[in-house]
Amino acid sequence: MGDMANNSVAYSGVKNSLKEANHDGDFGITLAELRALMELRSTDALRKIQESYGDVYGICTKLKTSPNEGLSGNPADLERREAVFGKNFIPPKKPKTFLQLVWEALQDVTLIILEIAAIVSLGLSFYQPPEGDNALCGEVSVGEEEGEGETGWIEGAAILLSVVCVVLVTAFNDWSKEKQFRGLQSRIEQEQKFTVIRGGQVIQIPVADITVGDIAQVKYGDLLPADGILIQGNDLKIDESSLTGESDHVKKSLDKDPLLLSGTHVMEGSGRMVVTAVGVNSQTGIIFTLLGAGGEEEEKKDEKKKEKKNKKQDGAIENRNKAKAQDGAAMEMQPLKSEEGGDGDEKDKKKANLPKKEKSVLQGKLTKLAVQIGKAGLLMSAITVIILVLYFVIDTFWVQKRPWLAECTPIYIQYFVKFFIIGVTVLVVAVPEGLPLAVTISLAYSVKKMMKDNNLVRHLDACETMGNATAICSDKTGTLTMNRMTVVQAYINEKHYKKVPEPEAIPPNILSYLVTGISVNCAYTSKILPPEKEGGLPRHVGNKTECALLGLLLDLKRDYQDVRNEIPEEALYKVYTFNSVRKSMSTVLKNSDGSYRIFSKGASEIILKKCFKILSANGEAKVFRPRDRDDIVKTVIEPMASEGLRTICLAFRDFPAGEPEPEWDNENDIVTGLTCIAVVGIEDPVRPEVPDAIKKCQRAGITVRMVTGDNINTARAIATKCGILHPGEDFLCLEGKDFNRRIRNEKGEIEQERIDKIWPKLRVLARSSPTDKHTLVKGIIDSTVSDQRQVVAVTGDGTNDGPALKKADVGFAMGIAGTDVAKEASDIILTDDNFTSIVKAVMWGRNVYDSISKFLQFQLTVNVVAVIVAFTGACITQDSPLKAVQMLWVNLIMDTLASLALATEPPTESLLLRKPYGRNKPLISRTMMKNILGHAFYQLVVVFTLLFAGEKFFDIDSGRNAPLHAPPSEHYTIVFNTFVLMQLFNEINARKIHGERNVFEGIFNNAIFCTIVLGTFVVQIIIVQFGGKPFSCSELSIEQWLWSIFLGMGTLLWGQLISTIPTSRLKFLKEAGHGTQKEEIPEEELAEDVEEIDHAERELRRGQILWFRGLNRIQTQIRVVNAFRSSLYEGLEKPESRSSIHNFMTHPEFRIEDSEPHIPLIDDTDAEDDAPTKRNSSPPPSPNKNNNAVDSGIHLTIEMNKSATSSSPGSPLHSLETSL
């Protein structure tokens, strides 16, 4: 494409480029050129920009965008950009087709056994012994009616058909589950928005809509959604470890390193960038595409080599625990592993298998329970088969003394196959394969409904873990309060105003300082916009504390925008942006006479300590002594704080023109010797619904703690208003430094015993840093002082809250105020930032737990009865009263349909009236065990009575001891029908697990339950009346049906009888399904601690491997690719899909073990040459400390003595050489 304009185009030409975009068909820069530019680093990138485009404005010109106005937003222009440069979207891995899911469902071992047995049965049923030989085969073949022999194949075919039904139902469930997860994934993507400038307006658009040429505003906490080049930056620091492996934050500036890469985190500062690459063309996209494509191409080869590899290298591939990757929203790649085996292998294995968090409580309990039930079922089915075979052999060859005739062999084998099928059906019924389905359905249903309750669940298991929560550590601002801040009090010109004063009451020079200081020393992204509806409140955009200060100016009848127009963001000389360590923000202005003025704002106690002067009543600065400061603290700040106000101090300092220029990087020397302008009290009202929500939590046995950065008096006042603290209670309120002093020993190390003395009584942690929050959360989780280990939920919104959110059992991020980094580290996103939504999450979590318990109570009752009936019946009557096909139908009711019916019960407020279950609470309580055994007893009595006396009662032929291929009997049909109807009515009983009397309460609120129960009943009628030979059923009369229904309904009456027996009397009942025992935990926790300690080190290596793999295909020779592949690609499994760039960096990608594999360097000679060179080959610093493009004095003087192929210091290739 031809250049649209010369590189030295005047700045005015940039503004006109928007108009040109409408009629000029081509851009002045190609996709390939942009990709090549974004692959360069630091000095190489600067050289390329200077040589080819002049500066970043030259790139804006070629992309036909304005650095100040952005794109016009014209749909035709946006479409053309997407067509040329691509869409900001990485295509997800194709979902599994329905046929693939069917194939996966067919892999079930019990179903395979059943299929084989059915095929054998089918084949043998066509064999008939020669005429006249029937008598020789003994009684086994007697009793067949004429024509019945020909229908012997039906049972085998019916079993196959039933297996097909089960497989189709399973596949359909998996398909709908996957569809739902993809829906959740797209919902998460839609939630991700980014701030851009279009048509001169600052707007937020979905990440997928960002296109090349957009001017994006980046700020602290953002996860960059695309590649770009910096136009203007304020103290911008980026965490690039996810891509380059460098664990140190990288300072971005126009004169050193202006390239911003997708998938990296903004850790400090703010700025604007022009987007240069999106989607698969961004750096994240390129690597993702290469890994994905490479994996698919090599997948087949890998599979062929797998066996050989496993033999050659022990444990080459480590399967990582994916507790957090079930939902498809946060898939993880398989870790790499060293080829070196040896003694360290076991340690390596443990380390590689470190989960993000320990396995979810419910999963652990269910797995344990399922294994126990499975073992019992296998034992029962084996005993059943052995008894049947022995009974048959002894009766035929011992009692009847028959010889084994060759022509009778197929008949005998048919019997053995029949016995085998009975054994397998016992196993099928006994093994609770419906458990995982019930969990999935319950979680998926809950997740869908929780979205309506403003909980966007990113990790499925967080949903059920929330039901066990015993403690919530909540932020204050925005979660407990409304996050709509207003200045309500002020201390200006030595007067304490209880409401905002009139502008006339303030001396003009103080007012001037106040207006300028607030206007320029608040982020320019913070602003107050007119209300959306007439009569509504003005909209606060950006940081809410800054909006309160801007609101103060409006109350003083001054317009901050006039000041900002006069001093645009580009003109700010230096900005010390706010972070959790500074707790302040400062901005330096350069005056026309060469002097400087710095404005500071921040926590009052921090800024006041740096003030040596204060503006007096007449507007003059006077000395501010320590005792004056103490007076202000006592008479102004403490009274404000006790009313729950946040106090902010505003100050300034002048640097005269004649003095040498200060050392701007030495912040401590700059932000000191200040003159105090004012102290303001900002009110952030408690959300009206919060006190009630906290009361519910306390009633539900959940302790709520407030962790805030505000001072202790403000925090205490708000905690009292919320109901976290009550007057007269003996609870602790600590400041961060006091908390640290109490929990650390003389060496400064944290001791768990010290934390254990504090946390049970701690309710408020004020002036705390994110590190304090992490320490508290970890201390509570690791504590063993209480009987139950604590399950902790945490809320967070800042970038530095990531560690605490990850450490917590459930991390809640704020959907509105939260940074992208916090959202990526969280399990659930609160879309309304409201504490009451957390209470709803607790309800849903407990509901999931109860739903699983309801299903277990129902299923185990069926299991016990079906297994005992099949076993006893088979041993006594030499045949199972419930046939294989009938068992499969029961299994279908029991597993799939019941799990759907019971797992979709909506939650009720009553769930919050009991204490949390905790980690070690068994899944099956003694009340549930009483219900299971009580109902099993009733059902067994009914079934055995019908089995051994039913024919007399109903005056029909007995179905016992029927010969092979005998027609279905009414007797056994009644047994089957009654058995199914008892399960159906017991499903209603199973809705209550805490001994409640009214089992029908709320039944009509669950349409799915009612539909399934009625649907099952209708299908049962069809099976019995029209099922015939395939279902081994004979038509029943109305009288027989009424008796079956009556006996089925008896379970409801029997349930009432069971409820009257107090559980406390039944001491002999055991609980089942316990969680992880206490002594099993420390190892996991220890491993997790090791993970945290080694995080930075592993982060470094992980990032390098990731970059190395992406770059080696693009930038280096084929021999290096081959060498690299031979050493590293072995043992790498194909990464699973991610659907968008934004989610690509969700989790750490690779784990490299301590014993590092040998990785060939890109060029060993270069590495040696580079070693002695100094790393300061960057250009001399610009006199403009803010690194803005407006400053024409930027010198892009770069050393040109390096060859293009060698890696310059600071580049990713160089860091690879030096580190790897």
Swiss-Prot record:
Phenotype upon changing E824K: In MRD66; decreased calcium ion export across plasma membrane
Which residue stretches does the UniProt record annotate as biased composition, category Basic and acidic residues? 312-325, 337-356
Summarizing the function annotation, the protein's role is: Catalyzes the hydrolysis of ATP coupled with the transport of calcium from the cytoplasm to the extracellular space thereby maintaining intracellular calcium homeostasis. Plays a role in blood pressure regulation through regulation of intracellular calcium concentration and nitric oxide production leading to regulation of vascular smooth muscle cells vasoconstriction. Positively regulates bone mineralization through absorption of calcium from the intestine.
Which GO cellular component terms, listed alphabetically, does the Swiss-Prot or TrEMBL entry include?
basolateral plasma membrane; cell projection; extracellular exosome; glutamatergic synapse; immunological synapse; intracellular membrane-bounded organelle; membrane; nucleoplasm
* Phosphoserine sites (modified residues): S8, S17, S338, S1140, S1155, S1178, S1182
The protein's name is Plasma membrane calcium-transporting ATPase 1
- The protein's predominant localisation is membrane
How does the record describe its quaternary structure? Monomer. Dimer. Oligomer. Calmodulin binding. Interacts with PDZD11. Interacts with SLC35G1 and STIM1; inhibits calcium-transporting ATPase activity after store depletion. Interacts with YWHAE; interacts with the monomeric and dimeric forms of the YWHAE but prefer the monomer form; this interaction inhibits calcium-transporting ATPase activity. Interacts with NPTN; this interaction stabilizes ATP2B1 and increases ATPase activity; this interaction controls T cell calcium homeostasis following T cell activation.
UniProt entry tagged with the keyword Calcium: yes
